[in-house]
């Protein structure tokens, strides 16, 4: 469950290292974001000499949360961290590599490019 002011790790090589959620895209009064939701975030930590800089406002899709995700078949998935992938306005990832496991639910939400770059899909 991601809400505004939540810090997230970045799961790609776009240059950002840590994000802070500012807003959840979708409804105007949504309190929490879950896996597959698009958020507006600000970069809190970044790698030097990369296109993305600190305090830059970007969009990101959530790929891992510490809160449990219950599937239709009864399986429960929980990750060790909250992580997101930086995307552009069209929904394509800005990085060329994805780190860590990604949830299968992203495929149903048409983030197929992120799924194809991921080393492991759970």
UniProtKB/Swiss-Prot annotation:
Q: Which HAMAP family match?
A: Ribosomal_uL14 (MF_01367)
Which CDD domains does the UniProt entry name for this protein? Answer: Ribosomal_uL14
Quote the subunit structure annotation.
Answer: Part of the 50S ribosomal subunit.
The highest taxon in the source lineage is Eukaryota
Q: What is the documented function of this protein? A: Binds to 23S rRNA.
Offer one example of a GO biological process linked to this entry. Answer: translation
Q: What is its main location?
A: plastid
* Protein's name according to its UniProt entry: Large ribosomal subunit protein uL14c
Gene behind the chain = rpl14
UniProt keywords (A-Z) are: Chloroplast, Plastid, Ribonucleoprotein, Ribosomal protein, RNA-binding, rRNA-binding
Name the family the entry cites: Belongs to the universal ribosomal protein uL14 family.
One annotated GO molecular function is: rRNA binding
Q: Which SUPFAM superfamilies match?
A: Ribosomal protein L14
Write down the InterPro entries for this protein, in alphabetical order.
Ribosomal_uL14, Ribosomal_uL14_bac-type, Ribosomal_uL14_CS, Ribosomal_uL14_sf
Subcellular location(s) of the protein? Plastid, Chloroplast
């Amino acid at each position: 469950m991601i809400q505004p002011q939540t810090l997230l790790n970045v799961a790609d090589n776009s240059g950002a290292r840590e994000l802070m959620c500012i807003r959840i895209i979708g409804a105007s009064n949504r309190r929490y974001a879950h896996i597959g939701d698009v958020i507006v975030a600000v970069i809190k930590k970044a790698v030097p000499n990369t296109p993305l800089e600190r305090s830059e406002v970007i969009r990101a899709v959530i790929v891992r949360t510490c809160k449990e995700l219950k599937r239709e078949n009864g399986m429960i998935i929980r990750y060790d961290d909250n992580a997101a992938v930086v995307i552009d306005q069209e929904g394509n990832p800005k990085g060329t590599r994805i780190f860590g496991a990604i949830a299968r639910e992203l495929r149903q939400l048409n983030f197929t490019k992120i799924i194809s770059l991921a080393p492991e899909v759970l």
